[in-house]
Structures are given as structure tokens and as C-alpha cells.
Swiss-Prot record:
It catalyses: 7-aminomethyl-7-carbaguanosine(34) in tRNA + S-adenosyl-L-methionine = epoxyqueuosine(34) in tRNA + adenine + L-methionine + 2 H(+). It comes from Buchnera aphidicola subsp. Schizaphis graminum (strain Sg). One of its GO terms (biological process) is tRNA wobble guanine modification. Pfam families: Queuosine_synth. Pathway: tRNA modification; tRNA-queuosine biosynthesis. It is found in: Cytoplasm. Monomer. Transmembrane segments: none annotated. Its EC number is 2.4.99.17. This is S-adenosylmethionine:tRNA ribosyltransferase-isomerase.
Length: 357
């Protein structure tokens, strides 16, 4: 398949710079995967789509204030974006600088540049940075002087309020450099209402890396290599999924990260061996993929030519997805991380759909 098959134009005016004031009052586009039928609702109407006995699964990762601004020894400015914490003193990160970054060079951060670090390695496209002579751990440093890493398409500086807006209300495990944005629409009253209705609620963890913002650079999408991210799916959750399906309930995934985590676990030994699934995954889901776990997906509106729109096409069907996006643009839905959402059911014919290239 050609990358250009997944191109469409989104007016800049539809890119959301801030979320809806009340999380659950964002708009919701509902698409039936089998019929392609579309309905326009508000997010709190999701309560009418999810039934007693269904299992809804969230990604409980928590966003790190992952962006640091500092200086080189020469005085030149640098911007560091955390990819992964390696240990108490070292990180894997991308570095922006006006000039070339050299190995074995120093970087300085914090008040009066008192926090000193040293570039000790390179693992394409990231640098390995070790923080020196600091009593504080890397986590402490980022929590104290880091900035919330808003996506590059939100053309404004991050504000203090983003520290809460760009987190889900159920965040727990610190480790992401981007929010699992489908979950941003859930507030505590909505979660309570789902629970009262008899919907089972559970969690897994996928720590989202900066690779989520990287474009596909191959004309043929099959040649794209996904970045790796750490996933944790408990054995208890796997057994709960099996029991839910056995009883006729549906599995609802909140976000593409949740779906990718579940599919990764499904293809592992953990699925049938009653073991926790804790591994890096680089699963790339695109049209032609047959989904094994999830019956319905809640997701935001994604960038054209992104791995995320390809996942949605694989789940909903290519034609259904393009029609839904056309309808969303026509009706002025808000796009991307702080935008509106979709609720889509699985189209079992999607894996066999022909996409003209």
C-alpha cells in the first residue's frame, strides 16, 4: 500500500489547541463498522453505546514533564525530549540544537545550570545522556524542571494548566512522553456512571514514546519500522477478557495504544500461559490486519499518513474511515490530541477490503 492512500487535508482551523472545558462534553462521532452508518453525539453519550457486561480497558500511563531546556558548554541552547528512562541517572532522548551534537560533550540544565549531564552514547535516532553528581534521580529532575511535551502541531508554549489537561483522570504509572489522548474525554462522573451501569473497568500500561510523533518516511507503508514501547498487561486482565467474551460481553479499547497493547499480548505466550505480559512492542497495525481482541474502539481524530490512521482503517475499514473523516471535517469536529473523539465498532470485513494503489 502507498503512503499517499492515507492522505487527506485537514483545515488548520480544526486543530484543537485546548481541550473541551468539561472533558465529557467534547463531541463524539459514532460509526458502525458493518454498515458505515454515522451518528453525531457528545462524548457523555458513550454511556448509551457500552452495555452492562462489557469490559472497557484504559491505558493508565502518566505523562512525564519530558522536555528540558538547557545549554551546551559553548553556551548554545539545547532542547532535550525524553524517550525513555534507562536507570536512576541515565536517559534515552532526542536533542535539538542549532549546531551538531558531539559525543562526550556536556549539557547543563536548571537554575544557574547546576544540573550537569554528559552524552555517553548514541542509539539512532536517540542519545544516551547521563546526569552527573546529582543527589536527585532522573525522575526528580524532570518533575522539578521539565515541561509537559505538547505535540508539535499545538503551536503554543505549554502552560501550567497543561500539567492537568494533558493527563487522564486515572493516570497511574509514570513513563509516557505523550498522553493516551482518547482517555482525556473521561471524567470521574462518567467513569462512575459506567461502573453503575454494570460495565467492567480495567487497566493496562503502554508507555508512549516520542516516536508516536514521527512521520512514516517510506512510500510503501509495509516497509515502515515502528518504534518500540514498553507494555504491561496483567494475567488477571487477560483472563478477564476471555471470561467477558465467553459470557457474550464486548471488549472496548480506549485508544490505539490500548488496542496495540492487547494485540501484542494476544500474540505472546502470556495469552495462554497465565503470565503477565511485560515487553517492548513495535507492532504495526495497518489494513489487512485481522483483529483478535477488541470489539469497539474509542479514539481521537488522527494525522493523515500516520500509523494511527492506518490502525483505524484496519479496524473500521478504509472506505468507512475516509467517509467518517470527510464527515468530521464537514461538521467542524476538532482534531488531534486536544480534539474530539470517535466510537467505532469492528468491521469484520475490513481485513479483506481492497485498497486501490
Amino acid at each position: 500500500m502507498h503512503l499517499s492512500n492515507f492522505y487527506f487535508k485537514i483545515p488548520k482551523s480544526l486543530i484543537a489547541f485546548y481541550p473541551c472545558f468539561i472533558r465529557s462534553q467534547s463531541r463524539l462521532l459514532i460509526i458502525n463498522g458493518h454498515t458505515g452508518k454515522i451518528a453525531h453525539k457528545f462524548f457523555f453519550n458513550i454511556l448509551n453505546e457500552i452495555n452492562s457486561g462489557d469490559l472497557i480497558i484504559f491505558n493508565d500511563t502518566k505523562v512525564i514533564p519530558a522536555r528540558l531546556f538547557g545549554y551546551k558548554k559553548s553556551g548554545g541552547r539545547v532542547e532535550v525530549l525524553l524517550e525513555r528512562i534507562l536507570n536512576k541517572n541515565s536517559i534515552l532522548a532526542s536533542i535539538k540544537s542549532s549546531n551538531e551534537i558531539k559525543m562526550n560533550s556536556y549539557l547543563f540544565f536548571g537554575k544557574k545550570n547546576k544540573i550537569k549531564s554528559f552524552i555517553i552514547g548514541y542509539k539512532n535516532p536517540f542519545y544516551i545522556i547521563k546526569f552527573l553528581h546529582n543527589k536527585k534521580s532522573v525522575i526528580d529532575i524532570f518533575n522539578n524542571i521539565g515541561h509537559i511535551p505538547l505535540p508539535p502541531y499545538i503551536k503554543r508554549f505549554n502552560e501550567k494548566i497543561d500539567s492537568s489537561l494533558y493527563q487522564t483522570v486515572y493516570k497511574k504509572n509514570l513513563g509516557s512522553v505523550a498522553a493516551p489522548t482518547a482517555g482525556l474525554h473521561f471524567d470521574l462522573p462518567l467513569l462512575e456512571a459506567l461502573s453503575k451501569k454494570g460495565v467492567d473497568i480495567d487497566f493496562l500500561t503502554l508507555h508512549i514514546g516520542s516516536g508516536t510523533f514521527q512521520p512514516i518516511r517510506t512510500a510503501k507503508i509495509e516497509k515502515h519500522i515502528m518504534h518500540s514501547e514498553l507494555v504491561e498487561v496483567s494475567s488477571n486482565l487477560i483472563q478477564k477478557i476471555k471470561l467477558c467474551k465467553k459470557k457474550g460481553g464486548r471488549i472496548i479499547a480506549v485508544g490505539t495504544t490500548t488496542l496495540r497493547a492487547l494485540e501484542s499480548a494476544y500474540h505472546s505466550n502470556s495469552w495462554n500461559n497465565k503470565k503477565n505480559y511485560v515487553k517492548d512492542t513495535n507492532i504495526f497495525i495497518y489494513p489487512g490486519y485481522k483483529h483478535n481482541v477488541v470489539d469497539a474502539l474509542i479514539t481521537n481524530f488522527h494525522f493523515p499518513e500516520s500509523t494511527l490512521i492506518m490502525l483505524v482503517c484496519s479496524f473500521l475499514g478504509y472506505k468507512n474511515t475516509m467517509n467518517a473523516y470527510h464527515e468530521a471535517i464537514k461538521n467542524n469536529y476538532r482534531f488531534f490530541s486536544y480534539g474530539d473523539a470517535m466510537y467505532i465498532t469492528y468491521n469484520t470485513h475490513a481485513p479483506y477490503e481492497k485498497i486501490l494503489t
